[in-house]
Amino acid sequence: MKVLHLSTADANGGAARGAYWMHKALLQAGVDSHMLVADKFTSDPTVTGSTGITGSQKIRKGLRQTLEYWPLKRYKNKKSGVFSPAIAPNNIAVQVEAIDPDIINLHWIAGGFLRPQDLRKFQETRHRHLVWTLRDMWPFTGGCHYSGTCAAYQTSCGSCPALGSSNFYDLSYKTWQRKQSAWKNLDITIAPLSNWLADCARQSALFSHQRIQVIPNAIDTNKYRPIDKATARNLLNLPQNKKLILFGALSPTADSRKGFTHLRDALQHLSSQPVSSDYEVIIFGTDKPAQNIALHLPTTFLGYLNDDITLAIAYSAADVMVVPSIQEAFGKTSIEAMSCATPVVAFKTTGLQDSIVHQHNGYAAKCFDATDLSAGIKWVLEDESRLQTLSEHARQTVESKFTFSHQAEQYKSLYRQLFEAVSSDVSYSTSSLA
């Protein structure tokens, strides 16, 4: 049984890294796993893709991205989030045929890597079951990766708020229609990272009739492990005598979905507390902005942390991690922090609900209530004995649910079911012809 993972990249971003780690975990578990990407950043021989080193490869990548995002230029009121129309041509189907997998596992395939019609091509020469690891909402929307308050994907997209469009027959409508046409009667199993994302998929018009099975994301608990707090703080030149409040993501202050404004309001509440002089805020994922962002507490910016070791050091240095996101498919930073024995304070919403157990391994605040978010931070930090218990429970949660071995075994079981079902169908068809 040969499995092929399709992902836009094998590193350089949370979705890409998650796909690559899953591929490596399956190899470790004895699965004949391969990976095909548009942009290859690792030197792994089990990954096929362009390294972007040669001039022609750079030109192809530039053309792909230009074609992919050209239609968006007409939408002058488009919001800042990613929108992927998936129109750039490619030769992925030819490469898939050369590898000849039994099962194809799709991951994050936007950015001009695949078009909706390509999925049907994978099953033209022989039956191959498709599994789609949902890492955001794009597979069942008209192009946005997170829908916010919009629920148009439950019927059909159009008049897209992400595009700032009032035209029903806009790019989101056309993209959604292309998906519906291409995926009609397609044999595919949907594997969302969280129960919230699974519920969204079940409610969507595109996937409501597909098999949906939640398989959580996973991390390397050997890399993301508790490090002595004093040592971690020394390595990052952080104060030893402060309660450190950590916040971070890709573009944490610019991406509205990450909830920075809620954090800012919560910290303003916290700054009025008598013990606020004990607190300091640490932010990773961005440099210190040119303009003051008024966090009301002393703040250190660590910049972009691009390796697991430095991230683990940052998590271990903190007393609490705050994840004030509005929507998260899973919330990988929360799991990474918990694996380093750092409790998490977040809103009780979307994918974060699968990992944070209120007042057991962190604090689940009322949705988008900055006052309760502030209360949660204070509650975690104000009692040393409680903080120690929360930290232990945080690590235990990850070890019991979110390890590579847990993830690999669930996917192995799913692949085996699908492969055996296909094999029995083929055997039946062959015997019927005899």
Outline where the language-model segments fall:
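Short hydrophobic beta-strand element within catalytic cores of glycosyltransferases
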Residues: 343-346, 356
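Conserved acidic donor-binding segment of nucleotide-sugar-dependent glycosyltransferases
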Residues: 358-359, 363-370, 379-385
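Aromatic "clamp/platform" in nucleotide-sugar-dependent glycosyltransferases that forms part
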Residues: 326
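Short glycine/serine-rich donor-binding loops of glycosyltransferases
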Residues: 331-334, 352
